[in-house]
C-alpha cells in the first residue's frame, strides 16, 4: 500500500469545499460548503458538518480514506478550512468574544516588540487549535449501516463507525481545556500547550530563550483567560434489548461528546451515534496493574435521536403483497391476537388486550395537558396459568422492552439512580427500567411481591408518563412513555372465592385505577377444558411447536413490522360517537353503584375505553374510530370486570339472558319511548350476548306484549 501524500490530499479537500454545489428548485447552483465557510468566517455558524455522501459523488477513494483514518483527516479538513476562511471573510466580525480580543491584543503587542522581518520564536508560535474558532464533524455515508455495540471490536480502532443504542447515563456539561496558556514570572513570555487527551501534565519551567540564556529558572503559571476551552460531556450507551443474544449481558460503550453535539441526548433516549472509535490509556494505579490494556471510547461526530416510529429500529419497510394478503384476510383481528404466544392454549380475550397494548392509543395534549395513549394491563391469576409466559413473549415481540421482576427490582432500579462518576467524582443520573423502556413496554413479573414503597414509584409513570427526580441536588424530569404490563398472584398464592375481591387482590385503588384492564385468570376444574389443555401441552412437548390450527400463526417479524405501521396512524374520535361513549360510561357508573361493584369505576375508565377504541382503529389502519371499535373496547372492559367478579358476574347471564337483555334495552330509553333496533342489538352484543340470544329475548318479550318491533325491524317501542 502506497504512502499517502497528505499535501495532495489537502488540495483535494480544498477543491471539494470550494467547488461542490447542488442545484436548488429553481436550477441555481448552491455552493453548500462555500455558504458554510462564509457563515464560519462571520461567526454566524459554529460547527461545520461534512457529509461523506457529497464527497462520494466525486471521489469515493477519499471517502474510504476518511473512514479508515478519520482522526488524521479531521485535522486535515480543519487545516484546509482555516486556510480558506480569509478568502470568504467579507466584513469584520461584529460579535467578538474574550478570546478574540485576547489574540488580537497579543498579536498587536508582539508586532510592536518584534523587529521588522524577524521570524517568531517557535515557543511563542500560536497553535492552530487556539486560532481555530470553529468545529468540524463528519456525517457518515448512507451505506454505513448502524452496527451493534458488541460488533465494534479492535479492528475498528481509528475508523468512523455508527452504532445504535439507548442512553443510560449522561454527565453534566463541563469545560474541557484544549490549549493551556502559561505566563513566565521572570521574563513574561507566554507558552502554549495543546492538550489532546482528557488528562495532561502542566508545564512548570519556562522554555523561552531568555530564561534559558540567563538561567533565571522562570516558573510558568496557568493563565485561564488566555486558554481555550470547549464544551465536554460524557455519555454511556447500551445495546437495545432486541440486539442482546439470549442469556447475554447488554454491552455498553462510553461516548465523549464535545462542542455543539452536547445536550442532545438524555437518559432513556434511543440514539444513533457516528464517531471515531479510539483507545485511551488507563491512568494512575490502574495503569500500573493493567499497563497493556486500554479503555475504548467513541468520539462523537454526529448524534441523531431516533424518531417515535419503530420503523428505524425494526427495519420495517413496505410490506409485500403476500404479507398484506396474510394480514388483510377475514378475522385478521382474531388472527393477530391468536398469533401472540400460539404455544399457549386459550386466553383469547387476554391476547386481544395484549395486542392492543402493543399498538397503543393516541396521545392527547389539549392546551399543554398531556393525556397518555399507552395502555396499562395487569394480569392476575392462580399459579400455572401462563402469565409469565405471556409477559416473556410480549417482551420478545415489542421492539423496545424491558423485563424485570418485582422481587428483584427496587424503586431506584425502576425509575432512576444517582451515581458518582468514577473519573470526575461528580453525581450523575442513570435511568432505570422504566426510563430505558421509553416508547416501549415494561414487563414487571411478580408485581405483588414488590415492596409497597417501591411500588408507589411507578404511580407517576403510569399516568403522567414521566419520572420526576429530586436527589442529591439533581432536579429533573425524565421521559418514561411506556406501557406497563404487570403479572401478579392473588394474596396467599391462589384466588380464594370465599374472600372478597379486595382481600384477594390487596392492591390500592390508586394503583388499580391506573390499569386500563385488570384481568383475573382463574384455574377452575372443568373436564372438557382440562382435556383440551392437556392434549395441547402434550403435543407441544412432543413436537416442540404449537398444534396445527385453522390458520398459520403470523411470523414475529411480520407482526412487529405491522404493529410499527399501525403506530404511525393517529385516529380521532368523531363527534357522532361522543354521545354514545358518554351514555355507555354513565351506564357503567350506574351499574357499578347499583350492584356495589368491587371494581373501581372512575373517569380513568372512560379514558381507557377511548384508548382501546383508538388502538382498535389503528389496528385497522384507519383515521377514524367507528362504533364497532367502541363496542369491542366496552366488551373487553366488561369481560375483564366479569373475570374479577367470577361466578357472581356470570350468574345473571347463565340463568336468564333474556332478563338481562331486557334491562339493557330498557336502560337505553326513557319511559314510554322507543329505541333503534341496531343500537339495542349492538349494546347487547357489547355486553357479551350473541345475536341469537338477543333475537330470542326480543321474541319472548314481544309475545308478552312488553314491546313491539315495527315491520322494517328498525325500532323497538315499549307498550
Curated annotation (Swiss-Prot):
Residue(s) carrying Phosphoserine: 121, 314, 365, 500, 678
Keyword Glycoprotein: yes
PROSITE patterns reported for this sequence: MCM_1 (PS00847), MCM_2 (PS50051)
Domain MCM: start-end pairs: 332-538
Keyword flag Transit peptide: no
EC number(s) recorded for this UniProt protein: 3.6.4.12
InterPro entries to which the protein is assigned, alphabetical: AAA+_ATPase (IPR003593), MCM (IPR031327), MCM7 (IPR008050), MCM_CS (IPR018525), MCM_dom (IPR001208), MCM_lid (IPR041562), MCM_N (IPR027925), MCM_OB (IPR033762)
An example molecular function term from Gene Ontology annotations: single-stranded DNA binding
Binding positions for ATP 2 per the UniProt entry: 514, 604
Region (Interaction with RAD17): 521-564
N-acetylalanine modifications at: 2
Stored CDD domains: MCM7
Residues involved in ATP 1 binding: 345, 384, 386-388, 489
Broad class of where this protein is predominantly found: nucleus
Coiled-coil boundaries: none
Record localization: Nucleus; Chromosome
GO cellular component, one term: nucleus
Keywords (A to Z) from UniProt: Acetylation, ATP-binding, Cell cycle, Chromosome, DNA replication, DNA-binding, Glycoprotein, Helicase, Hydrolase, Isopeptide bond, Nucleotide-binding, Nucleus, Phosphoprotein, Ubl conjugation
Catalytic reaction list: ATP + H2O = ADP + phosphate + H(+)
An individual GO BP term: DNA replication
Annotated region (Interaction with ATRIP), positions in chain: 577-719
Complex formation: Component of the MCM2-7 complex. The complex forms a toroidal hexameric ring with the proposed subunit order MCM2-MCM6-MCM4-MCM7-MCM3-MCM5. Component of the CMG helicase complex, a hexameric ring of related MCM2-7 subunits stabilized by CDC45 and the tetrameric GINS complex. Interacts with the ATR-ATRIP complex and with RAD17. Interacts with TIPIN. Interacts with MCMBP. Interacts with ANKRD17. Component of the replisome complex composed of at least DONSON, MCM2, MCM7, PCNA and TICRR.
Protein task: Acts as a component of the MCM2-7 complex (MCM complex) which is the replicative helicase essential for 'once per cell cycle' DNA replication initiation and elongation in eukaryotic cells. Core component of CDC45-MCM-GINS (CMG) helicase, the molecular machine that unwinds template DNA during replication, and around which the replisome is built.
Note: Early fractionation of eukaryotic MCM proteins yielded a variety of dimeric, trimeric and tetrameric complexes with unclear biological significance. Specifically a MCM467 subcomplex is shown to have in vitro helicase activity which is inhibited by the MCM2 subunit. The MCM2-7 hexamer is the proposed physiological active complex.
Family membership: Belongs to the MCM family.
Protein name: DNA replication licensing factor MCM7
Source organism of this protein record: Bos taurus
Amino acid at each position: 500500500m502506497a504512502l499517502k501524500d497528505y499535501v495532495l490530499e489537502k488540495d483535494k479537500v480544498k477543491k471539494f469545499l470550494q467547488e461542490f454545489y447542488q442545484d436548488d428548485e429553481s436550477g441555481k447552483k448552491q455552493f453548500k460548503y462555500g455558504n458554510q465557510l462564509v457563515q464560519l468566517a462571520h461567526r454566524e455558524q459554529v460547527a461545520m458538518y461534512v457529509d461523506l455522501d457529497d464527497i462520494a459523488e466525486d471521489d469515493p477513494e477519499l471517502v474510504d480514506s476518511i473512514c479508515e483514518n478519520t482522526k488524521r483527516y479531521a485535522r486535515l479538513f480543519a487545516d484546509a478550512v482555516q486556510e480558506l476562511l480569509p478568502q470568504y471573510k467579507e466584513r469584520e466580525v461584529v460579535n467578538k468574544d474574550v478570546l478574540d480580543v485576547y489574540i488580537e491584543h497579543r498579536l498587536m503587542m508582539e508586532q510592536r516588540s518584534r523587529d521588522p522581518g524577524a521570524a517568531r520564536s517557535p515557543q511563542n508560535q500560536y497553535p492552530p487549535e487556539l486560532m481555530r474558532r470553529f468545529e468540524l464533524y463528519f456525517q457518515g455515508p448512507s451505506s454505513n449501516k448502524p452496527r451493534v455495540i458488541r460488533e465494534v471490536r479492535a479492528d475498528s480502532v481509528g475508523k468512523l463507525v455508527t452504532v445504535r443504542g439507548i442512553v443510560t447515563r449522561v454527565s453534566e456539561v463541563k469545560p474541557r481545556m484544549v490549549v493551556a496558556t502559561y505566563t513566565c514570572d521572570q521574563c513574561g513570555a507566554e507558552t502554549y500547550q495543546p492538550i489532546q487527551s482528557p488528562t495532561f501534565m502542566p508545564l512548570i519551567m519556562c522554555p523561552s530563550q531568555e530564561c534559558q540564556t540567563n538561567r533565571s529558572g522562570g516558573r510558568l503559571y496557568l493563565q485561564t483567560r488566555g486558554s481555550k476551552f470547549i464544551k465536554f460531556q460524557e455519555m454511556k450507551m447500551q445495546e437495545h434489548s432486541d440486539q442482546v443474544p439470549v442469556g447475554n449481558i447488554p454491552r455498553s460503550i462510553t461516548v465523549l461528546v464535545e462542542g455543539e453535539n452536547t445536550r442532545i441526548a438524555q437518559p432513556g433516549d434511543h440514539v444513533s451515534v457516528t464517531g471515531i472509535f479510539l483507545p485511551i490509556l488507563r491512568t494512575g494505579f490502574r495503569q500500573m496493574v493493567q499497563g497493556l490494556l486500554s479503555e475504548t471510547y467513541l468520539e462523537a461526530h454526529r448524534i441523531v435521536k431516533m424518531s417515535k416510529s419503530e420503523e428505524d429500529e425494526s427495519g420495517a419497510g413496505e410490506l409485500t403483497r403476500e404479507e398484506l394478503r396474510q394480514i388483510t384476510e377475514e378475522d385478521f383481528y382474531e388472527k393477530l391476537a391468536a398469533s401472540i404466544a400460539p404455544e399457549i392454549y386459550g386466553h383469547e380475550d387476554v391476547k386481544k388486550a395484549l395486542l392492543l397494548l402493543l399498538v397503543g392509543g393516541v396521545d392527547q395534549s389539549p392546551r399543554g395537558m398531556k393525556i397518555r395513549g399507552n395502555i396499562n394491563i395487569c394480569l392476575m391469576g392462580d399459579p400455572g396459568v401462563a402469565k409469565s409466559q405471556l409477559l416473556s413473549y410480549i417482551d420478545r415481540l415489542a421492539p423496545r422492552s424491558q423485563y424485570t421482576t418485582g422481587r428483584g427490582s427496587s424503586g431506584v432500579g425502576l425509575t432512576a439512580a444517582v451515581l458518582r462518576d468514577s473519573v470526575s467524582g461528580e453525581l450523575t443520573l442513570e435511568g432505570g427500567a422504566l426510563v430505558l423502556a421509553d416508547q416501549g413496554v415494561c414487563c414487571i413479573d411478580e408485581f405483588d411481591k414488590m415492596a409497597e414503597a417501591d411500588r408507589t414509584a411507578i404511580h407517576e409513570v403510569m399516568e403522567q408518563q414521566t419520572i420526576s427526580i429530586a436527589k442529591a441536588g439533581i432536579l429533573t424530569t425524565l421521559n418514561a412513555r411506556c406501557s406497563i404490563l404487570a403479572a401478579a398472584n392473588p394474596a396467599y398464592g391462589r384466588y380464594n372465592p370465599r374472600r372478597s375481591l379486595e382481600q384477594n387482590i390487596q392492591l390500592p385503588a390508586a394503583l388499580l385505577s391506573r390499569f386500563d384492564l385488570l384481568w383475573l385468570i382463574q384455574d377452575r376444574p372443568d373436564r372438557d377444558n382440562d382435556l383440551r389443555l392437556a392434549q395441547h401441552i402434550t403435543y407441544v412437548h412432543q413436537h416442540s411447536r404449537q398444534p396445527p390450527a385453522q390458520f398459520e400463526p403470523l411470523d414475529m417479524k411480520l407482526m412487529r413490522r405491522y404493529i410499527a405501521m399501525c403506530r404511525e396512524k393517529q385516529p380521532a374520535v368523531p363527534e357522532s360517537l361522543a354521545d354514545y361513549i358518554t351514555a355507555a360510561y354513565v351506564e357503567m357508573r350506574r351499574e357499578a353503584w347499583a350492584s356495589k361493584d368491587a371494581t373501581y369505576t372512575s373517569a380513568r375508565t372512560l379514558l381507557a375505553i377511548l384508548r382501546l377504541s383508538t388502538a382498535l382503529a389503528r389496528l385497522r389502519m384507519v383515521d377514524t374510530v367507528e362504533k364497532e371499535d367502541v363496542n369491542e373496547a366496552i366488551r373487553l372492559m366488561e369481560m375483564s370486570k366479569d373475570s374479577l367478579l367470577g361466578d357472581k358476574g356470570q350468574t345473571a347471564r347463565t340463568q336468564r339472558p333474556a332478563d338481562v337483555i331486557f334491562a339493557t334495552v330498557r336502560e337505553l330509553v326513557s319511559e314510554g319511548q322507543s329505541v333503534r333496533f341496531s343500537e339495542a342489538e349492538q349494546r347487547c352484543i357489547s355486553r357479551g350476548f350473541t345475536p341469537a340470544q338477543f333475537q330470542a329475548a326480543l321474541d319472548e318479550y314481544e309475545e308478552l306484549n312488553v314491546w313491539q318491533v315495527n315491520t322494517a325491524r328498525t325500532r323497538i317501542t315499549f307498550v
